[in-house]
Amino acid sequence: MHVIDASVWVASFVESDVYHRASMEWLAGQVDRGATVVSPILALPEIAGAVARRTSQKSLGIRATEMVLRLPNIRLVPLDLRLSRLAADIASRLRVRGADAVYVGLAKALNIPLLTWDREQMERARPEIDVITPDVVP
């Protein structure tokens, strides 16, 4: 089980993304194995906005979120007060963006690795959690 950052989801939906193939293959492998993938509910608007922005097609952003919601092995975690406080602490201590801190906080709370392509998030979160990229994980 892994927490999946929006960068991985977005790369899987944007064919021109340099990480598209690795992201697609990793996610497909998780679905095939029936492995649970976890993201905060915040991932949905992040995915929709980034996909629509990068493709200049708003319908693709919505379609991407619908595809995520249809995955049989997805667990979307609400952003409650406990996770928000943890993310606020992480954002302050590690100097990461608020949304990035939510993913890091969720991985920390669940004691599972974070899967991301975001280099800054990766470097700053490593003292707190295991952070990996799809190209180094089965």
Q: What is each PLM-predicted segment?
A:
Residues 1-39, 54-66, 137-138:
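Short, well-structured N-terminal submotif of metal-dependent ribonuclease cores
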Residues 32-34, 71, 110, 128:
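Structured helix-beta-strand junction loops
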